[in-house]
Curated annotation (Swiss-Prot):
Originating organism: Caenorhabditis elegans
GO molecular function: identical protein binding; lyase activity; ribonuclease T1 activity; RNA binding; RNA endonuclease activity
Effect of residue 665 to G: Abolishes RNA-binding
Region (Disordered): 445-468, 523-591, 620-693
Function of the molecule: Guanyl-specific endoribonuclease which cleaves the phosphodiester bond in single-stranded RNA between the 3'-guanylic residue and the 5'-OH residue of adjacent nucleotide, resulting in the formation of a corresponding 2',3'-cyclic phosphate intermediate. P-granule component involved in germline development. Together with the P-granule component pgl-1, is involved in the formation of P-granules. Together with pgl-1, probably recruits other granule components such as pos-1, mex-3 and glh-1, and RNA to P-granules.
Protein keywords: Developmental protein, Endonuclease, Hydrolase, Lyase, Methylation, Nuclease, RNA-binding
Record has RNA-binding as a keyword: yes
Species classification: Eukaryota, Metazoa, Ecdysozoa, Nematoda, Chromadorea
Domain notes: The dimerization domain also acts as a hinge; changes in its structure probably impact oligomerization and RNA-binding. The RNA-binding RGG-box is required for the recruitment of some P-granule components such as pos-1 and probably mRNA, but is dispensable for granule formation.
Active site: 437 (proton acceptor)
Key word Transmembrane helix present: no
Effect of residue 665 to A: Reduces methylation of the RNA-binding RGG-box. Abolishes methylation of the RNA-binding RGG-box
Biased composition (Polar residues): 528-548, 569-580
Protein's name according to its UniProt entry: Guanyl-specific ribonuclease pgl-3
Length: 693
C-alpha cells in the first residue's frame, strides 16, 4: 500500500497540515462563530478563545478524525493523536485501520513502538529537504521530548520553517502550554495567527481579540441548558404556569401559544428518551395538571402515552448506539396496543408530535437536545428524527410490513442503519415469547436492504462536509412539509380512471372518488332527531374554533335528509269512510276497507313524484308517473315500490319496461313512456295506469 504524504494546505488563507478539517470549518463558519458561539463546534470555540473549557477527547477526535474523511485528513489526524499522548492512542490505531481500507498506510503505524526503528527513521529524515520530511522530523522530535517546554520548542520549528503558526497555536492550546515561561512565546504565535486572519477572515480576528458576543440569556433558557435531572421540575412548572395563563383567554393568539407550550413539554419528553432516562418522561406527565395533560395528550393519546414512550425510547436508543437490553413489548403493554387499530393510530399521533418537537424551534432560542452530550447536536437530532420516523413506520404499517408500499417507505434509512436495526431486533427477539411482529420487522428491513430503491421512494441526502453546524435551527427545514400536494391531470388523461383510483395525498393517507351513497330502502330508518349542538361547539366551516359562532348539527346525515326531502305536494289516499263517492260506487257499494299499511314509501324521479300510500291508487294516464298497486311502476327516475314486500324499481331512459314479480320489485319506469304493473299475468286490474312523459 502507498505510504501517506504530509502536505500543507491553505484554506481561504489559513495554512495547515495537522488540522485541515478545523481550518475549513473556521473559514466556512466565521459568521456563526461571531454571532452564535454557543451553537458552534466546541473545539473551534476553544481555539479562538471564546471559551476556556477544553473540549472532550471525543469532541476533539470528531474534528481531527471526521467520519468519511479523505486519506490525507485521516493521516494528519493520526499524527495529532500521537502528539496528544496515550489517551489518543486507541484513536490512532482505529485510524490506521480506516486508512488501510482507503489503500494507504501510515508510515509510523508499524514501528511506533520500536524505538530503534523510530531512531533510524529520524536520521534518514534529516537528510531530506521536502516539507514532508520537515514535518515528520518535527513530529519525531516532539514524540521524543519529555517536558512541555521542550515540546513547544520543537513545535515552534513549524512556525519558523513552514509558516504553520495556526497548527502550532492549536497544539499549544490542546497540550495546555500555560506556564509563565512559555506565555510570551505563545502570545507571539497568537499574534501571527490573528494577522493571518486579518487578511482572509477578519471576523475571526475580531473574535480572538474582542471575544464572542454575549447576548442576555433569560433564566428559563439557562435552566434548559443545565442537566435535566436538576431542571426538570422547574422547567415543567414554568411551562405549565404559562399554559394555564393562556387558557384563561379564548382567542387565536392564546391557542397558538398553548400549542407551542405543549410542544415544549413534549420536547422535554423526547430529551429524556434520548438521554436514556425514560422514567423522566413519566415524571413530566405526572407534573402536568389534568387540564393541561388533557390538551397536550387529548383523548386516547393519554391512554397510550406509556406505549408510545416505550416504543420511541427503544428505537432511539438503538439509533444512538445503546447496547442495553430492552423490555418485552408484550410485558409493557405495547404489543396489545399495537394490535388495536385505534390505539395504534393514537400512538402514531404521539410519535408525530415527538418528531415535531425536535425539528421545530419550540423555544425562543435554539436549545440543544442533549446539552451535556459529547455528540454533535445536529447528529443527535438526525438520529432521533430517523428513529421516530422508523417507530412511526412500525405503527402505520403494522400487519403489512412486507408489502411493496411499506418497503418503499424504508428508503430513508441508510444501509448502516438498516443493518444496525436488524442486528438489534434479532437480539431482542431471542428473549420474546411471541416473535411474529418482530420477525416481520426484521424480514422487511432485510428485503428493503436487498431490493433496489424505488423511483418513487422518498430520497434523502446527507452532507458529511466540513460545514456541518450544531444547530437545531438548521435541521428544521428537513421535515417541515411532511405532506405533499397531489395534482390531478386534466388533459390527455382518462379522468374517470384518475378519479376512481386511489391517490396518495400525504403520509399514509389516500383518497379516491366513490359512487354516491344510494338512497336507503326504508325511509323510516332515517334519523330525524333535531340537532342539539351548541354554537360554541361547531362553526360554519366545520372546524372547532371559539372565534366562530354559527352552529352546525352534529350529524351530517340530518343535513343530507333535509336536502333530499321532496318539496312536491303529497297526495294521501282517503280513508275508507271517505271513499263512498269513488268510481266503485256510492253508499252501500263502498268496498270493504283494506288494511292500511304502516309504511309510506317516498319516491322521486324526473317529474313530480307523489307518495304511493296504501295498496292501490289511480293516477291519470297523462300524469307524471304511473302508480301500481301489485308491483306497479311509474315513469320517471324510479319505479314504484311493489306491494306485498316488493322493493323499488329503477328509472329508465327509453321505453318503459314491464313490472316484474310483484313480491320482489316494482316495474322499471321510463322517461318517455310509463310502465304497467304486472302480477299473475293480469295487467291493469290491480296494477297502476300508464304514466306520462
Amino acid at each position: 500500500m502507498e505510504a501517506n504524504k504530509r502536505q500543507i494546505v491553505e484554506v481561504d488563507g489559513i495554512k495547515s497540515y495537522f488540522f485541515p478539517h478545523l481550518a475549513h470549518y473556521l473559514a466556512s463558519n466565521d459568521e456563526l462563530l461571531v454571532n452564535n458561539i454557543a451553537q458552534a463546534n466546541k473545539l473551534a470555540a476553544f481555539v479562538l478563545g471564546a471559551t476556556d473549557k477544553r473540549p472532550s477527547n471525543e469532541e476533539i477526535a470528531e474534528m481531527i478524525l471526521p467520519n468519511d474523511s479523505s486519506a490525507y485528513v485521516l493521516a494528519a489526524g493520526m499524527d495529532v493523536c500521537l502528539i496528544l499522548g496515550d489517551d489518543f492512542r486507541p484513536k490512532f490505531d482505529s485510524g490506521a485501520e480506516k486508512l488501510s481500507q482507503l489503500g494507504q498506510a501510515h508510515d509510523l503505524a508499524p514501528i511506533i513502538d520500536d524505538e530503534k526503528k523510530i531512531s533510524m527513521l529520524a536520521r534518514k529524515t534529516k537528510l531530506k529537504k521536502s516539507n514532508d520530511a520537515k514535518i515528520l522530523q518535527v513530529l519525531l522530535k516532539v514524540l521524543g521530548a519529555e517536558e512541555a517546554e521542550e515540546k513547544f520548542v520543537e513545535l515552534s520549528e513549524l512556525s519558523s520553517a513552514l509558516d504553520l503558526d495556526f497548527d502550532v497555536y492549536v497544539l499549544a492550546k490542546l497540550l495546555g502550554f500555560a506556564s509563565e515561561e512559555l506565555q510570551e512565546e505563545i502570545e507571539i504565535i497568537r499574534d501571527n495567527v490573528t494577522d493571518a486572519f486579518e487578511a482572509c477572515k477578519p471576523l475571526l480576528k475580531k473574535l480572538m481579540i474582542e471575544g464572542p458576543k454575549i447576548d442576555s440569556v433569560d433564566p428559563f433558557t439557562q435552566l434548559l441548558l443545565t442537566p435535566q435531572e436538576e431542571s426538570i421540575e422547574k422547567a415543567v412548572s414554568h411551562i405549565v404556569a404559562r399554559f394555564e395563563e393562556a387558557s384563561a383567554v379564548e382567542d387565536d393568539e392564546s391557542l397558538v401559544l398553548k400549542s407551542q407550550l405543549g410542544y415544549q413539554l413534549i420536547f422535554l419528553v423526547v430529551r429524556s428518551l434520548a438521554d436514556g432516562k425514560r422514567d423522566a418522561s413519566r415524571t413530566i406527565q405526572s407534573l402536568m395538571p389534568s387540564s393541561v395533560r388533557a390538551e397536550v395528550f387529548p383523548g386516547l393519546q393519554r391512554s397510550v402515552f406509556k406505549s408510545a414512550v416505550f416504543l420511541a425510547s427503544h428505537i432511539i436508543q438503538v439509533f444512538l448506539g445503546s447496547m442495553k437490553s430492552f423490555e418485552d413489548w408484550a410485558f409493557v403493554g405495547l404489543a396489545e396496543d399495537l394490535e388495536s387499530t385505534w390505539r395504534r393510530r393514537a400512538i402514531a399521533e404521539l410519535l408525530k408530535k415527538f418528531r415535531i418537537s425536535v425539528l421545530e424551534q419550540c423555544f425562543s432560542q435554539p436549545i440543544p437536545l442533549l446539552p451535556q452530550s459529547e455528540l454533535n447536536n445536529e447528529t443527535v437530532i438526525e438520529n432521533v428524527n430517523n428513529a421516530l420516523q422508523f417507530a412511526l413506520w412500525i405503527t402505520e404499517f403494522y400487519g403489512s410490513e412486507s408489502e411493496k408500499k411499506s418497503l418503499n417507505q424504508l428508503q430513508f434509512l441508510s444501509p448502516k442503519s438498516k443493518n444496525l436495526l436488524v442486528d438489534s431486533f434479532k437480539k431482542f427477539a431471542q428473549g420474546l415469547d411471541s416473535k411474529d411482529h418482530v420477525n416481520r420487522i426484521i424480514e422487511s428491513l432485510e428485503k428493503s436492504s436487498s431490493s433496489e430503491p424505488s423511483a418513487t421512494a422518498k430520497q434523502t441526502t446527507t452532507s458529511n462536509g466540513p460545514t456541518t453546524v450544531s444547530t437545531a435551527a438548521q435541521v428544521v427545514t428537513v421535515e417541515k412539509m411532511p405532506f405533499s400536494r397531489q395534482t390531478i391531470p386534466c388533459e390527455g388523461t382518462d379522468l374517470a380512471n384518475v378519479l376512481n383510483s386511489a391517490k396518495i395525498i400525504g403520509e399514509s393517507v389516500t383518497v379516491a372518488a366513490h359512487d354516491v351513497i344510494p338512497e336507503k330502502l326504508n325511509a323510516e330508518k332515517n334519523d330525524n332527531t333535531p340537532s342539539t349542538a351548541s354554537p360554541v361547539q361547531f362553526s360554519s366551516d366545520g372546524w372547532d374554533s371559539p372565534t366562530k359562532s354559527v352552529a352546525l348539527p352534529p350529524k351530517i346525515s340530518t343535513l343530507e335528509e333535509e336536502q333530499e326531502e321532496d318539496t312536491t305536494i303529497t297526495k294521501v289516499s282517503p280513508q275508507p269512510q271517505e271513499r263512498t263517492g269513488t268510481a266503485w260506487g256510492s253508499g252501500d257499494a263502498t268496498p270493504v276497507p283494506l288494511a292500511t299499511p304502516v309504511n309510506e314509501y317516498k319516491v322521486s324521479g324526473f317529474g313530480a313524484a307523489p307518495v304511493a300510500s296504501g295498496f292501490g291508487q289511480f293516477a291519470s294516464s297523462n300524469g307524471t308517473s304511473g302508480r301500481g298497486s301489485y308491483g306497479g311502476g311509474r315513469g320517471g327516475d324510479r319505479g314504484g315500490r311493489g306491494a306485498y314486500g316488493g322493493d323499488r324499481g329503477r328509472g329508465g331512459s327509453g321505453d318503459g319496461s314491464r313490472g316484474y314479480r310483484g313480491g320482489d320489485r316494482g316495474g322499471r319506469g321510463s322517461y318517455g313512456e310509463g310502465s304497467r304493473g304486472y302480477q299473475g299475468g293480469r295487467a291493469g286490474f290491480f296494477g297502476g295506469s300508464r304514466g306520462g312523459s
